[in-house]
Amino acid sequence: MNIYESEHIYLKKASMDDTVAMYQNVWSDRDISKYMNFKPIDNLDDAKIMMQQSIEYQKSNMGFLVYDKETDEAIGFAGVKNVSDSDYAESGLCIAKKCQGKGYGKELLLLLLSIVFDELHGDKFIYAAMEGNTVSINLCRSCGFVYDSSETVIRKWDNYEYVSERYTLMAKQYLSSYGS
């Protein structure tokens, strides 16, 4: 199993042991879910179902939970997906509110960029953020992403219509800034 790590966090596949931490830190947090595509979870039984779905998804996709190195606690999730020959997109990116403002989001995004450009040899990384999610937009811009386009999207679980802003980073720009 691949484990990716940076100074303060690491990524690895989920396990049922992480259910309570993900429920408390992410899935039940309405402030986080308002910018995400998952429905907030209201009880531990639903969190167990969500974790089983996450584990199943991660078996055939590049999805991970994010862990705090100091505590080994699950504090978020992240993933990338192949969208064309050598283009990749983030498939979700989230850090628990209690861990925000510590630079973990940037460490997380840089880990994903390293996976896409250094390991998978991708040409382009696509990042999407809900219009108004200034923390997410500022994060991708701080890593060199540039605005590409916008589209109106309807979130499935609550039929909420929003504008999804799309940002891109090319391998050439990544390698000139962070290259290995």
Which residues are covered by each model-predicted region?
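Acyl-donor (CoA/ACP) binding surface of acyl/acetyltransferases
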Residues: M1-A21, N25-D29, Y67-S180
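Generic structural signal for secondary-structure transition and capping sites
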Residues: D31-I32, E56-K59, H121
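A short helix-loop-beta-strand connector motif used in the catalytic cores of GNAT acetyltransferases and
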Residues: Q52-L65
